């Protein structure tokens, strides 16, 4: 059965979705899930080959998708990507702001250049993307925004000081959008994963283990039980983006198998 026929009455049928950082990992899994549920999907990412691969996967399954290469730390490139998406699919009413990265390094060894780069990719990009999105969603009847934060927004982790800062910042961005734009019909929530089986997540675990921590086996068992799969995060994002979550606003959704609750 094609993706189109399966998703004729899908949970996101009739919606137009933009995903930043949608070329790989959680972003790719969510792009595929959005399309499977009936959304038209625009992917914004700096990774060109991987972005087109994701679009190809969606189209081969019968969905509709476009890729727009963009450095999401630059407002002019973001604007070009949004303009291209609107030209292709019309006004969007779902945004999954997922683009991000990580640095694993002791605070005393973290350079100003490290700080600027990580905050630009994780925080400035979210500010620029959401600034454009709330304006257009307000003009077009509202929509749903989901921002990828992390349990690192709430819990402090050694060797990830700037990463934790950045994820706390975007969690607060989600919360403030939810209050400021609620009456414009915009919902905004954050998804907060633990460790996820992506290139990003596995690199993080390897770097932490190399620094003397024990996340790969014992640490994982003690905190979240096992590693999370990107499709499990995507399922949470689909719910938050859908009309099923019509009264869910300003929420931090932990996809961590109880890690944050356990503390």
Residue locations for each model-derived region?
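Active-site loop immediately N-terminal to the catalytic Tyr-X3-Lys motif
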Residues: 108, 155-161, 183-184, 225, ...
């Amino acid at each position: 059965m094609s993706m189109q026929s399966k998703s004729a009455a899908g949970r996101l049928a009739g919606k137009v979705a933009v995903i930043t950082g949608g070329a790989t990992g959680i972003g790719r899994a969510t792009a595929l899930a959005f399309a499977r549920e009936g959304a038209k999907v625009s992917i914004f990412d700096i990774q060109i080959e991987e972005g087109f691969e994701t679009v190809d996967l969606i189209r081969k399954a019968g969905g509709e998708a476009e890729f727009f290469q963009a450095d999401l730390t630059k407002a002019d490139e973001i604007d070009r990507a949004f303009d291209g998406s609107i030209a292709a699919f019309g006004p969007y009413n779902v945004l999954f702001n997922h683009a991000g990265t990580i640095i694993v390094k002791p605070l005393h060894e973290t350079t100003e250049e490290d700080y600027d780069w990580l905050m630009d990719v994780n925080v400035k990009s979210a500010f620029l993307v959401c600034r454009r999105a709330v304006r257009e969603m307000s003009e077009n009847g509202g929509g749903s925004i989901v921002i990828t934060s992390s349990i690192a927004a709430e819990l402090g982790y050694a060797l990830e000081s700037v990463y934790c800062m950045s994820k706390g910042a975007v969690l607060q961005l989600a919360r403030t959008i939810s209050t400021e734009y609620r009456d414009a019909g915009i919902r905004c929530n954050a998804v907060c994963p633990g460790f996820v089986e992506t290139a990003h997540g596995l690199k993080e675990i390897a770097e932490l283990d190399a620094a003397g921590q024990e996340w790969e086996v014992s640490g994982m068992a003690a905190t979240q039980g096992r590693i999370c799969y990107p499709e499990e995060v995507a399922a949470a994002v689909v719910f938050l983006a859908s009309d099923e979550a019509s009264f869910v606003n300003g929420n931090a959704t932990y996809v961590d198998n109880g890690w944050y609750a356990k503390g």
